């Protein structure tokens, strides 16, 4: 028995020594690792984490708005277990929000139908079972005061708050409903204090007794916002909003995350251009935010995805960009400085560096459209360009670039808007295409 104990102790010491050696030889890699894929591609879904389980609810797959849900348990090493399907929503919905409180998940607002034109006021509730699966969804008796596509939610003082979004016009209003002891919601009321500005396709996160509203879509121009505002979640229900340190990058369709006293703004769009940039800031005791700084970017530019943080890991779920809709899941660690990456071997670092170099040296892909610049109108955020293509002409708009009449340019596919009115220019275009990329022909 003594010899057996000695052997076990020796093996334990060897294991500890090996682990310490491996950690000493590990290198920090500023990148992302692949995790288990979802069953369905999803953008505009609601993604949240509850007790080590990630839930992906609703969204759009590029063709249809979804009523399906799925979930995955986070393993001890940060990897995700295979995704499992769970209870379906009563209403297919995308560009909505969902939050958890006391074992219930609440899903509110959003849109459905062609281009999300059917705006939703309804709220659904489900209970999380002991296995992590969702039980059947129940549609709440009381609906929100306003339909809100791209609504954002948070819980404070046993009330569910809904803010911003689109109801035929962009909203700055806030409303809330009491959460009853059985999990059901009471009647919604409009809050006295609105946001400091309209908010649409923005992000919201609660952090250490404060709620933050981050970015969004500018009301008078199709660009992102840098503005951030916050409120203290006081016990008297009176929420007063004020602005704090803005981000460096304007963005809408972004996601966000929190870790400790750090707040992250992730990806999104500015104009028609997708972003892979991630910024991080630190929260002060009074809720004010410090200067934002850049950290490791996403593995690809994307918007309308989900992000969650659990322990020291951050996860990116689904989303979309010009290449399509994603069912991928990626994860990374957060170090003591708040930077994003993972610990790996020297070989993994070299492989990562080669991959990044290959991206930079990859030849530019020829864009599908081209023409000659016939007219240019510049605004702070956009270049509006009348392009001559043989005997036809087309107005396009993209992120501000310096072009001259007579230049030959090429540009990507985009989103065509009929009877588009630019408030900045006080002008209506019969037809205009918003494009992500435009450049001079080499």
Question: Where are the predicted features?
Answer:
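Bacterial N-terminal signal peptides that target proteins for export
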Residues: 1-8
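Structural detector for short beta-strands of small beta-barrel domains
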Residues: 364-379
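Beta-strand/loop nucleic-acid-binding surfaces
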Residues: 392-402
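Kelch-like beta-propeller repeat domains
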Residues: 20-356
């Amino acid at each position: 028995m003594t010899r057996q104990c000695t052997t076990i102790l020796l093996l334990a010491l060897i294991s500890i020594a090996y682990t310490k050696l491996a950690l000493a030889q590990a290198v920090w890699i500023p990148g992302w690792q692949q995790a288990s894929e979802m069953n369905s591609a999803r953008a505009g879904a609601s993604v949240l984490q509850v007790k080590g389980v990630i839930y992906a609810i609703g969204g759009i797959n590029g063709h249809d708005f979804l009523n399906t849900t799925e979930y995955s348990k986070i393993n001890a090493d940060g990897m995700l277990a295979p995704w499992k399907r769970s209870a379906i929503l009563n209403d297919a919905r995308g560009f909505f929000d969902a939050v958890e409180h006391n074992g219930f998940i609440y899903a509110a607002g959003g849109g459905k139908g062609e281009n999300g034109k059917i705006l939703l006021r309804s709220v659904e509730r489900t209970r999380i079972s002991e296995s992590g699966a969702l039980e059947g969804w129940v549609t709440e008796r009381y609906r929100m005061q306003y339909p809100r596509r791209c609504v954002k939610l948070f819980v404070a003082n046993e009330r569910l708050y809904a803010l911003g979004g689109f109801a035929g016009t962009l909203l700055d209003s806030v409303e809330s409903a009491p959460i009853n002891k059985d999990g059901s919601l009471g009647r919604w009321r409009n809050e006295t204090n609105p946001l400091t500005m309209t908010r649409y396709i923005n992000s919201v996160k609660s952090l250490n007794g404060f709620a933050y509203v981050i970015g969004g879509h500018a009301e008078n121009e199709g660009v992102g916002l840098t503005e951030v505002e916050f409120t203290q979640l006081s016990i008297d229900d009176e929420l007063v909003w004020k602005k704090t340190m803005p981000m460096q990058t304007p963005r809408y369709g972004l996601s966000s995350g929190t870790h400790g006293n750090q707040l992250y703004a992730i990806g999104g769009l500015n104009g028609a251009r997708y972003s892979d940039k991630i910024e991080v800031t630190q929260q002060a005791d009074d809720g004010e935010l410090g200067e934002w700084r850049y950290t490791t970017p996403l593995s690809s530019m994307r918007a309308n995805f989900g992000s969650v943080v659990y322990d020291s890991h951050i996860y990116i779920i689904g989303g979309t960009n010009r290449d399509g809709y994603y069912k991928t899941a990626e994860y990374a660690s957060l170090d003591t400085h708040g930077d994003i990456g993972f610990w790996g071997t020297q070989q993994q670092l070299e492989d990562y560096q080669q991959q990044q170099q290959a991206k930079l040296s990859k030849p530019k892909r020829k864009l599908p459209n081209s023409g000659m610049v016939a007219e240019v109108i510049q605004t702070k955020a956009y270049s509006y360009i009348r392009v001559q293509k043989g005997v036809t002409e087309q107005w396009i708009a993209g992120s501000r670039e310096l072009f001259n009449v007579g230049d030959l340019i090429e540009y990507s596919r985009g989103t065509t808007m009929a009877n588009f009115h630019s408030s900045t220019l006080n002008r209506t275009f019969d037809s205009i295409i918003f494009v992500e990329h435009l450049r001079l022909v080499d």
